[in-house]
Amino acid sequence: MHPSILKYLPHRPPMQMVDTITHINDTSIVTSFQIKEDCILLDNGYFTESGLIENMAQTCSAIVGQFFFDKNDEGSKHVIGYISAIKKAEIFDLPQITQTIRTEATLLSRYDDKEYSICAMDCAAYYQHHLLATAQMNLFIKEND
């Protein structure tokens, strides 16, 4: 059984752009997301560039976010996170409604303070074996009391 993404992200619909975690450890993650008709980041039947970036950011943040929650928590802690920098992003293609994308991310570096974490990540989004997008981004995540 895969862990619930709700444990590791503060996002909820309609801004939740990850459905399932298929693999996670301390330094890498693989997620999936089915693009549905009610997705707010669609344009003419295609998932937008912004949607791909948000999907990759949410996938990345779950790696670090897992350490802010205990095993029994179902997203009740108040954790905030945001992209602090996108060093490089390339969009090669856009997926369509009903397609399921797979997103893979790897932690490159991480700095932890008492109240927050800053991390650098590499990520890529795919439809089947077709590369849709890549990015390297920095994320800032902290518990919001």
Segments predicted by a language model, with ranges:
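Compact, glycine-rich, soluble single-domain proteins
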Residues: 45-63, 84
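HotDog/MaoC-like acyl-thioester-processing domains
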Residues: 62, 96-145
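Short boundary/loop segments of OB/S1/cold-shock single-stranded nucleic-acid-binding domains
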Residues: 5-9, 94
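Hydrophobic beta-strand-centered segment that forms part of the acyl-chain substrate-binding groove
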Residues: 64-104
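Catalytic strand-loop segment that frames the active site of acyl-thioester-processing enzymes
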Residues: 12-48
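Short Pro/Gly-enriched beta-strand edge/turn motifs at strand-loop
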Residues: 1-5, 103-105
